[in-house]
């Protein structure tokens, strides 16, 4: 058990994992890590998209709309099937630098240890572009025409941030959601919550890339 989640690992499925050449993609919230993985995948590169398998974006607001997360056992089954049958361990595999948990499911211990030992590249993006990336990624929240509907569940999620950010900040963010000012809300969440709680990855990256939306 790790982080309150019971892990169901099958040792026979893990042999190929030791041979895998993983490169992590790190960066602050809104730096476009998932977009980079999708671009690499379309270009023919090998990608393990943990957020897609977990149906969660790895943050407090990360639930996929209308899609429940898989069980821990199903998450691991999907993951091991991809590693064992769909990936070539002799070629590079790109993985986002996730936390140990993605929503309610946990990254299996063996893969997590492999990720912690793997090299990474780091993405640096200006705040204005991070706001754009984030609003695009969470477009189902940032809908001014349906602000009342979009803000309904969003208000509940923002309320959960009170214990981390304080009561006043949480109230201010909920008010911005009610008003439909999603650009200001996104910027304040990035600066006042995500950046403050961002855990800097261990070690120096192989390379650092500055990215913009142009």
Outline where the language-model segments fall.
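Structural motif
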Residues: 27, 97-99, 213
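Phosphate-binding P-loop
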Residues: 13-20
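Hydrophobic/aromatic beta-strand patches that form the interior of the parallel beta-sheet core
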Residues: 23-25, 46-48, 93-95, 119-123, ...
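Conserved NTP phosphate-binding and transfer environment spanning the P-loop NTPase/kinase superfamily
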Residues: 113-214
